[in-house]
Amino acid sequence: IDQVMNEGRLGVAELKCREFLKKNPTHTYAMSQLSEIANRLGHFDDAELLLEKAVQFNPDDGELRMKYALVLRKKQKFAKTMEQVNILCDKYPDNLAYQAQKASEIMQNGQHEDAISLFDDILSKNPHNFSTFTSKGHALKTLGKTDDAIESYQSAYKIRPDHGEAFFSLANLKTYSFSNPEFMNMKEQIKRVDLSLRDKAYFHFALAQGYESNKQYDEAFFHLKNGNQIKRDQSKYSIERMDNELQAQIDVCNDEFFKNLDIGGNDTKDPIFILGLPRAGSTLIEQILASHSMIDGTLELPNILSLAQSLRGGDIYGKLGNYPKSMGSLSSDQRIDMGRKFIEDTQMHRGSAPMFTDKMPNNFRHIGLIH
């Protein structure tokens, strides 16, 4: 099965896994491999279910539980992800990979100072962990500690010069100027045939930013084009699918739809949703609102996206993937439950203010669900 998967013949590998599991229904490695196939095909609900059962059969397999946690994270179930990562860290306190994942989850929850402390603890034990330096840089950047973030990103690429994310992160600061040696390194790296496409895309985007800053616009567009081509080839994004999704929202969420709804939903005034297309100024609006003492700025919360995903997959409310049409068949109790769960799950991101912001850019795709 492993060989067939490595050859990319996922259909054959899936059949072999299923045949094997019919005879060995509790074989956790086979379940893990089948979940990997589902994961590669974008069937995250199936991957989650398989790994959940596998972990139940073999709760002491740390790597299996880590795979489960990462699938939960991919599905934006961050509370459940944190639960699994905590189990891993309790069971294997000396495993730095699990500690690093915990730090990333803490950072996801907005506890950046705590995350930095954990990153520093990891680096004290393994000072050559380049990815931890990069993650620490992200946390420092979020806290506005730009100079410290730069130092952390530079530490990452000094350990591994082909670590494209570190260079991209420096470029993404928008204020950083690459030195000549840094430029030379990036240009040499993208020539390598053995460089991963992920790193190569990062280098192209970093070079594009660097050339743009130097007013060398032809070179900047060249690298933007190449970086975006790599991302396009790897992406499952479809303009047609997006058009169909948005048209379905328009068709479903009309006047009649809302008039036919009875009572339901959570009537709390706590959340303030900042809706609009990405790069339309939502950050500025969030900062203005969050400057008020009665409003917590929580940045981009994933909860609405997770809720929409659950309705697509029949995960919680059993709507079998018919979103957004399925919203019309939700009972008032189900809508109240969804609102209650949103308030409870977002509590970890809030301070003590009575209201909070949610500026997740992709929430504009779910205006009907929010309403």
Annotated model-derived regions:
Residues L64, L369-H371:
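Short, intrinsically disordered, charge-balanced linker/junction segments flanking boundaries
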Residues I1-R350:
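Alpha-helical solenoid repeat scaffolds of the TPR/TPR-like class and their adjacent stem/linker regions
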Residues D337-L369:
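Glycine-rich phosphate-binding loop used to anchor ATP phosphates in small-molecule kinases
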